[in-house]
Swiss-Prot record:
Belongs to the UPF0102 family. GO terms for molecular function: nucleic acid binding. This is UPF0102 protein Mfla_2283. Pfam families: UPF0102. It comes from the Bacteria. InterPro entries: Restrct_endonuc-II-like, tRNA_endonuc-like_dom_sf, UPF0102_YraN-like. PANTHER family: UPF0102 PROTEIN YRAN (PTHR34039:SF1).
């Protein structure tokens, strides 16, 4: 399962680099949680949650970013910004489906703090 997650994050990273984003950190961890990718697009810090689902049961990948997960991401992002300097930021999601190898959905501003 961990390998599948690592592969999904690597695929998402390559996709976002092709879209012009720059990697700042991978798997940023603190006591509040973890952010899969921290990237930069222009002057904006982009916190990216990568989700892979094998099927659409229970809403697919997007539905798996529930309120508790969003709160952990927000706290972790605040921790990152306190240590690395404040900047405009947003939360994006990359949604991948095991059933559709070519299917990458990039949701910019997936949620707000």
């Amino acid at each position: 399962m961990k390998q599948l997650g690592d592969d999904a994050e690597a695929l998402a990273e390559r996709y976002l680099i092709k879209q012009g984003l720059v990697v700042i950190a991978r798997n940023y961890r603190c006591r509040f949680g973890e952010i899969d990718l921290v990237m930069k697009q222009g002057a904006t810090i982009v916190f990216v949650e990568v989700r892979m689902r094998s099927h659409a049961t229970f809403g697919g990948a997007a539905a798996s970013i529930h309120a508790a997960k969003r709160q952990k991401l927000i706290l972790t992002a605040e921790h990152f910004l306190q240590r690395h300097g404040s900047a405009p930021c947003r939360f994006d999601a990359i949604l991948l489906s095991k059933r559709d190898a070519d299917g990458i959905e990039w949701i910019q501003d997936a949620f707000s703090a």
